[in-house]
Amino acid sequence: MKNKEKFQGELSESSIARMIKAAPLHDIGKIGIPDRILLKPAKLTNDEFEIMKTHTLLGAGAIRKAIEQSVEIYNKNELSKPLSLLFLEDAEVIAKFHHEKWNGQGHPYGLKEQEIPLSARLMSVADVFDAVTTNRVYKRK
């Protein structure tokens, strides 16, 4: 995929490495979801599902805060922003957009097709694979 012309600018070795490092943070916003919803062993109600969907923005917001605090520390100490912070910027994008759908029916913004950042599209595929191959509290074993 990285050798295809249309992905040349987005899939360099360094961007792939950052995505791999950032991917585990994609659901970090679930820490803000009440356990009664997150661990519910049955189908969520519409209201519960609306709350669950907020994990994308909660996660992106938490990562944004970490970026801002890190940059503030670097600026205060007159240090240049390290390249390692780039993975947090990628993590913010992945956390925010990994539930967008190609057809525009996803959340939080209803983005579609190329509007969805490539890193989030790739995370979405991995997230679906994980969902269908992993036991969850709400799935029968």
Feature names for model-found ranges:
Residues 1-141:
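Histidine- and acidic-residue-rich, metal-dependent catalytic cores
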